[in-house]
Amino acid sequence: MRIILIGFMGVGKTTIGKIIAKKLKLNFVDMDNYIEKREGKSISKIFEEYGEQHFRELESESLKDLIKSDNIVISTGGGIVTTKQNLEILKKEKIVIFLDGNTQTILNHLSKEIDKRPLLSKSNNVENTISNLLNERYEKYNSICDIKIDINEKNIEEVVSQILVNIG
């Protein structure tokens, strides 16, 4: 079994992924952490030194590596859907779960870590930036998911429970 979590930054992919993996006795990999370990640099540093395009290439390479694994829960980065190559890979997967949160929920979740998010840290209007990026990506998330879970006004346990029911 391979479960892939997608959705915007701050929707809880990593937190929820770890819990799902533990409950199902699967391995867990957070793609951003995987990239940081592989590159020996933080995501922020990679963005700063090489730009977003380079990071997206690293993300694609990492996705290709990770989907070779079985018995795993993979938490992707929020921008995984920005490249056509990744969309094609993810469309072929059997269990892609879209954690769907609105702008306000995402803003609430990210409020303490905006400086760690390269696409938000330099923004003059974080709420607007989140809204715009979410609008750009929403249809892509929606088009490749097998299961969509609305996370708005739900606690982690409710989201986990909904996922477990949906994957049977």
Regions picked out by a protein language model, each given a short descriptive name:
Residues 19, 23, 107-108, 125, ...:
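NTP-dependent small-molecule kinase module
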Residues 14:
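Walker A/P-loop
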